[in-house]
Amino acid sequence: MVGGVQIAELWRYPVKSLQGERLDAVAVTADGLEGDRQFAIYDVESGLGLTGRRVPELLFASARMRADGTAEITLPDGSMAGDDNTLSDWLGRSVALRSAATEAARRYENVVDFEHESTSDWKPFDGAARAFHDNPGARVSLVSTATIGSWDPRRFRANVLLDGEGEDSLVGSRVTLGEATLAVGLRIERCVMTTRAQAGGIERDLDVLRTIARERDACLAVGALVIDQGTIRVGDTLGAS
């Protein structure tokens, strides 16, 4: 894939499973894009982190990072969620917004059978330490325009959208983007989140995950660890390290 492929879009998601913000440039830290997955909403009773898998309503709120490192959350009705009570009222359960600096367990749930979700079991899994990534090997996620085709890139919540094709071939290699160097280590296995309805007119579509399972071994996008930190920008060219 390396050779002339550029960054088409950059995205970060300050609060896990909420809509994120599109950026022109961003610093890359050891934990991924600065401000990415720095907060998560937790169910107080169960102690589990909530995601759009179990609570699809999350995908209709949005978050952006403030200059002071806090997250500004906008609820589906356009109002701001200033505290845990507001979030709890919205979701109809007692919840708490927690930051990546806390010692909260990184435990979430995924549905076992997305085709029969209403009767399926749910399986707990442990995510990465520090920033609230699902996979410790995917601090930065990359996907190409060719791979997603006509699908909205927001379904896959990747950080870097590359204008090209063939990101799977990067697995096992080191690449440069702007000032950053990444070690691409894995293909990202997809889940029911990709089928969810979202803000902005994205409709529920089980065929998305069916297609990924059938044609791509259930994987779409690649995950990377950060070797060298630095700033990346839209238009930066992917290079070999």
State what each model feature region is.
Residues 1-241:
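Metal-cofactor-dependent catalytic cores
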